[in-house]
């Protein structure tokens, strides 16, 4: 599927009513772990889409362009709510956290296996060792506080094993500043991989920043605090790989293309019919956003 060749809908047609935005959540007892981690990742992707467009809006002097951003951003926000609200009421904060760390080990492992740039692959492998330890430590907390083996949640899709000890992961900030990739010559997989992993890790960082202090006991709050600081390092580590010479509109195009790529991929693999319908709807909307980005890039930068 080439989203550039698909016939797009009108961007404004993507705005939906409240009933459509509020989804039917999955069942935590029967959900496939990969359905859950797709949801967690796409929540992060949509948060990145909304925040990127807010930053673009704040740094853009052209009100016509800002209106176009506001239109698609409203739909990104509806998408984020629909995806994030797939989480059920009876899933605890710590159970959700196990899902976040499942993403943090499964996603970079797959990206590293399919990454043609040796430097980027090394960056993925490096942080992966640290996220294994985060999963292991949260799994221990889940067993201690709720007497639930984390293996029940990940269903043996991933090994829960110690990684690089978290206590040894704290580094001076300068060490996270890696060399950026040249997107003018980079393989499309490298462009996608670096943007996907940065968005995914950013969502984990945001989750711990905002909810880590709400855990019900002091031991858990301390664990969330420490790992939240490592997530800051990981977001800096991965974000440094992105090409800083891309224009705002070039970055807009990359963001929309990434969303098309992920929604199509997840639609193809999804087993849950309810969640699959969400991926299908969002793919249609993102194809419209992509074509909007193409038109804006042509209009304002003649590219």
List the model feature ranges, each with a label.
Residues 1-303:
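Non-heme di-metal
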